[in-house]
Structure formats: structure tokens, C-alpha cells
Amino acid sequence: MIQEKKKFDAEVGKILNLMIHSLYSNKEIFMRELISNASDACDKLRYLSQSNSELVAGDSNFKITVKVDKDHRQIIIRDNGIGMNKDDLIENLGTIARSGTANFLKSLSGDSKKDNMLIGQFGVGFYSSFMVADKVTVTSRKAGEDKVHIWESDGLGEYTVSDSDKEFTRGTEIVLHIKKEEDTFLDHFRLKHIVKSYSDHIAVPIYFFDEAGNNEIQLNSASALWTRPKSEITEEQYKEFYKSLSYAIDDPWITMHNKNEGAIEFTNLLFIPSSKTFDLFHPDRKRRVKLYIKRVFISDENIDLIPSYLRFLRGVVDSEDLPLNISRESLQHNSVLEKIKNAITKRVLGELRKKKEESPEEYNKFWANFGGALKEGLCEATTNHEKLLEVCIFRSALHNKMISLDEYIANFKEGQSTIYYLSGDNPDKLLSSPQIEGLLSKKIDVLLFTDTVDDFWVNVNSKYKEHAIKSATRSDIDVEQTTSQSEEKNTDSTKSNDEYKLLTDYFKETLGELVKEVKISKKLTSSPACLAVSDAAMDIRMERFLIEQKQIANASAKNLELNPKNKIIEKIFNDLKANNKNNEELVNLIFDQACILEGEPVADTGAFSKRLNDIVQKAIL
């Protein structure tokens, strides 16, 4: 027998080290992981056998068996699924084979208490065996191949792979050599209870050997949970199915179990998690809804079954209208699949709209977890933009709570027809921004956008129900025109730029190319100045993001808006009228301050510091 000794990838070594030294209390999840893997192996072979029946010749009844050998301190899990050859064993058990495991590693903090919690939250498949075993032996024979291979490791950095001449039928057998301190898992009654807890939803029959090791007892009904009537399924069964499917420790927030019997027949059992998934925004993240055709698993990869902005969904979709022998390539642009996708999207958005109205506090928690992903749909070429906007909520600057666009519109001031927003990284900083002080002083609400995606979707969706959605950084905002014409108006704020031409020209001459235009502001009430952009220009935060991503080279010159009611600006204006033009340093300082408040870089930090020091010195001397 030829035996090869190999080292684990460094990443796998880290996971194994965590498993071996784990203090995680719910170690029984190793059975969930191994049973799920065995079920997947059977599903894969069932799918492949549709086009090649020889793969299951003589053994077409899939099953999983679990056996306890107390004398040898072993738990043995056996399946007759797809099996693995030598290369499969090395790739699947010796290296990082899935992005989820790599993402798990990135989430490790170094704090053993926190890291042990991650085990239960994310699931790490086969490697969880080493929480209870000090040695694991895997024997496997791949369907359609004759060779048998054995993989073995103690989890301490190395593993061996060898050929074997033992008699072994198709599939995989995993033998866990249980640690002395984990004796409870050798208790027949306890292990049977654990297996039954995790297996009831599994579509493959699972058999448990009695204590004598002779008779097999079937533990599960071996019928897919989603095929059963809802009236026969308990809440606990739904929860356990969700946890097994998604490797989660939380309970689902929403469960959607529906049978569609219209033009397209399909069943969906979908869940929205109650906790944020660690890899929600990872570029390699797979959508985790599995496609079945007539109870046969087809794929959960490279199929457009749900839109990417609903990638937080977990569950299964089982279609009656797709042929079992369909190729995965044919699924890429399939009209039936597209109709299923549209129906699911409509159903999910409908559930979210209902929750938003009935349980606003719960919905706020959902939004904090998944709102950023959901808003990505507003950037896509889809007919669902308005339905998506209906379920979006945003922070209200006026009321300091999350509100919908419909709530915002319902609270319009008399004469108002525009939805105003301000985008930035921190809601507290946005609340103190000069950009919105005039609007808030007139009780005109402003929505605070703090997700990066917000700056993108507003470029695609400039209106909602015929109301313009406008950034508060735009130059043409006139607070007085926005509110009721019956309100008393401050004549200073409505003076034309012509009346202050001496002032605006002086600022422009002093600042030169640093600014595009200098205007009198119709939205400032107390601050001396602010940056602004025209309606046709790119939003300030969006431009900054694209510069950071090296999509554009340089920032464009912005407009500078002045507040003639501010004492500093008033002094400069009065000096100019007295032919005193010695305020260049103060003008530059006002511009630098406007840049800082907007998150823009100061052109010359050294000069800014000197100006500030000079003004402070004049004030105290």
C-alpha cells in the first residue's frame, strides 16, 4: 500500500488548531456538518445518474448510516453517494476548497472566546470533526472508479493519503476516533438523539445501528421538508432545517413556504436570517438558495435563481417545469428560471413590505443587517425599482428615526415637492453639516444616507412617485421657495448674486481655480460658507469614492456658497464696500473650513495651519 504524507495548507492548519483547542459548548454540530456532507454527496450522484445510470448500477437506493463502536471509541458515518478519489480527498480535505472557509478565517479575532463562537455561527464542515476526535479516517471510492483511497489525520498539521485494496463499495466512510474527554458522544441514546435532531429534513434515509451493531433503525422520514404540507411542519422543524441548511445558530426571521401552481409550478422554502452573515459583501460569496427539479438537487452555484441583492436568502426552490437532464449551462439563460426568479422576488418584497408596516422595530433590525445589500438592486437594470424603494428606510434628520420614502412624502411641508438627502459616513456628522441647517430650520426633513451604495442608486433613481430625490449639496436649493409662500421671508437670503457681486468676485479672485463659482447661498442660516455642486455635476461623496477607487484621477472644482447673514462674511463685505481688500487669508481659511466640513482634502495643510495660527494670535494679542 503506497502512502503519501502531506502538510495541510496554512489556512486549514489554522482551522484545525481552533477545532482541537475549541471551548465551543455546542460541539454536537459536527454531526450536522457530516450528515449534511453525506446528504450532498448522495444528491450529487443522484443528479449525475440522470445522464449516466451506470454510476449507480446495482445500488440506486441512497442512504446514510451511523454506527457507534464503544469498544474502539469510534463513531462511523457512511454514505453511498458520489465518493472521492485521491485528488478529491486532497482538494476537499487538505486545502481551502470553498470561499466560505476562507472568509471564516478572515473573521477570526485572536480572542479565543469570540473565535469559538464563530464555529457555531459559520460552520466549517468536515473540520469540525476534530472538536471531538483526535484522529479521523476517511475511506472513499468514487462512483464509476475502481480504486479505494484512505485519508487519515490527527489534525496536527499533516495528513496521509494512501491506496487501499480493501473491499469497499461506492461512497465515503468517516471514522471518528473520539477523544477521551468526549465520551458522552459514544452514548448510544445521546448520539441517536443528536442525529435525529439534525436529520428529520434530510431527503436521504438515515439509519442508526442498534447497540449490538446488527439492526438498522431509520431515524428520519426521508422526505424533503418542503414537499410536506405546511400544516404538518412544526416551527421547530423549520428552524432546524434552516440551521442545517445555512450553518447558522440564529433562528430565521421570516419563513416563506409556498407552492406556486399557476403557469409555472414550483415550491419554495425560503428564509430570511435574523443575523447578518459574515460574508454578505464578499465578492466571491455564493447565493445560498438551492435549486431542485422534482426533488433532485441540481445546483446552488452559477444559477440565476435569485437576484444578487437578495443573496441573504437561504432555502430551496423545487421546480416541476424544468427537465431533470437540463445542463447547468442551459440554466444560465432559462425562461422558466427567469419566471421563477421574478415570482420569488415579488414574494420576498411583498413580505418585507408587510413586515415594515406591521413590525417596524423588527424591520429596523433587518435593515441594519441587510439594507445595504437590498439597495444594490436599485443600481441594477430591473423593473422592481419602485417596489424596492417602497421597502427602503432611511434615517430622518428631523425626527432621528428610520422612515420610509412614503412617510417622508406624507410629512412634506406646504409647498414642498422634493425629497432631500445628504450622504456621508457618519450620521452624527451629517446632522451638524452646514448643508442642511437651513432646511432643518424650516422643518424640512433631510434623509441621511450612510451606505456607499446610496451614492450610486440615487444616480439611477432620481425620482420616487413623481417627486425628485435631490442631494442637499446642490447649488440650486432655495429654502424659502421650498416652503410655503405665506411664511415670512428673510430679505437678506433672497438678495440676488448681483447685489453681492463685489463679495463673490473678491472670493473668486482670491481663490482662483480652487473654486468653480462663488454664489450667495439660499440654504445657509448660520455657517459662513459651504461647498456645493450644480445639478449636472457628480455628487461630492460619489466623486471622492471614485477617486479612492482610482476610477477618476482628480477632484473637480466645486462651487462655494456664502452666507451674507454670517458675521464673518458680513465683515468682509463691509470691508470691501470701504475699499478694504486685506482679507485674503480669511477668505482662504473660510474655503479650507468648508472643505474640511465636507470631507474634502485641504489643498495646502501647511498654509492652512499658518493662517489659523495667525488669526488666533491676532485674537489674543
Curated annotation (Swiss-Prot):
Region feature B, mapped onto this chain: 329-544
Signal peptide extent: none
Gene3D superfamilies: 3.30.230.80, 3.40.50.11260, Heat shock protein 90, C-terminal domain, Histidine kinase-like ATPase, C-terminal domain
Ranges for region A: 1-328
Keyword annotations from UniProtKB, A to Z: ATP-binding, Chaperone, Cytoplasm, Nucleotide-binding, Stress response
Keyword Cytoplasm: yes
Basic and acidic residues biased stretches: 486-496
Keyword flag Cell membrane: no
Role summary: Molecular chaperone. Has ATPase activity.
Name of this protein: Chaperone protein HtpG
Source lineage: Bacteria, Pseudomonadati, Pseudomonadota, Alphaproteobacteria, Rickettsiales
